[in-house]
Amino acid sequence: MATSKLPAVSGEEETTILMAKEELEALRTAFESGDIPQAASRLRELLASSDCTRLEVGVTGESGAGKSSLINALRGLGAEDPDAALTGVVETTIEPSPYPHPQFPDVTLWDLPGAGSPGCSADKYLKQVDFGRYDFFLLVSPRRCGAVETRLASEILRQGKKFYFVRTKVDEDLAATRMQRPSGFSEGAVLHEIREHCVERLRGAGVHDPRVFLVSNLSPARYDFPLLMSTWERDLPAHRRHAGLLSLPDISLEALQEKKDMLQEQVLKTALVSGVIQALPVPGLAAAYDDALLIRSLRGYHRSFGLDDDSLAKLAEQVGKQAGDLRSVIRSPLANEVSPETVLRLYSQSSDGAMRVARAFEKGIPVFGTLVAGGISFGTVYTMLQGCLNEMAEDAQRVRIKALEEEEDTQPDVSLEAAGDNGVEKRGSGEGSMEEAPLSTRRKLGLLLKYILDSWKKRDLAEDK
């Protein structure tokens, strides 16, 4: 991923623009050739390729490993949701079954039949599921890595592809160990033992650096599930990162920030397209194209951050709240709908800083000088989309803070001590006396997210001044 530093303008911080190296070179060639229509066409291709990049993920393992439940968890669905993968106590998958992401159908998780069934050789299984068609694999096992898993791992390596070993049902292992050895039980020690065994077995199968994740499909916020998602996104090749990241459920602040960083690339590309279209001598083209382009971009941001009605309803159901309660903390003017009238109003409000932004780009990336010499459309679109992206990202954080809040009437005044890591909250009880009580996980996350959001708002205010 190439980066371009834009110089600070009027006291502003430098802006880092992320763009794949091949994309930057293609843009450079188009602009240096002086062929503006070709540049416009190339930019539209880049935007289109980001919107329709496909990611095929094969989820494999023996029967009963929890593959279907893992797919549902990765897609942010429960077992009873309409589009959920079929789960059961017996094998329910008899042929490869595709499950597109609910919001992003170009990301597909394939539920593969159970491997290691009697009468089905390894070679026959690989042919049956068309093993070579998938970009990436999740190798799932409910037990300590055995012969079936090591055979599949070897085949994935032979194809030059990557996989993560996902050890499911660790909550059941912990419960069983706690029952068998209550006096000497240590959750950390049990998880360490399971992990080390899996790593050792995979290394014995030729895996140089095994990636092992211990998860419970029923508790996607616990154990290694958040780490699984962030590691998966980070390791995807550049041409797959966009689709992979947008498919991940936002269960952490880090996931939201990574999603915002990825959408930041689209802001620059969209502004460049708008600037090029403005330079074309075709009456009426610029206005018509800009309206459609901006509406499509803003609706994409809205959906990506889970601010649409379907996503809010699903989150509300998961946390036992009303969707209206979550919607009440959304402040963006785009909360209700992205209409041409709303876009026009935001566009006019963003024109003040247009030339300043355009000059920064012209100075930072001289090859774009032809485009930004006029600067009005490019700078206005960039300023508008950047502002909307920031607002929607903050709305997404506020929604998740609200989702994690305890009911107000059951919570006394609470303060989270910045220097402490002992997980306690201070509760007032009488005059001056303080009583320590365990800080619930939901309350801790809610307070932490609120603290970070307030810090970001203070930083933004300082930058505005």
UniProtKB/Swiss-Prot annotation:
It catalyses: GTP + H2O = GDP + phosphate + H(+). Residues 53-235 form the IRG-type G domain. This is Interferon-inducible GTPase 5. It comes from the Eukaryota. Keywords: Cell projection, Cilium, Flagellum, GTP-binding, Hydrolase, Lipid droplet, Nucleotide-binding, Phosphoprotein. The gene is IRGC. The modification Phosphoserine is found at residues 247, 304. One of its GO terms (molecular function) is GTP binding.
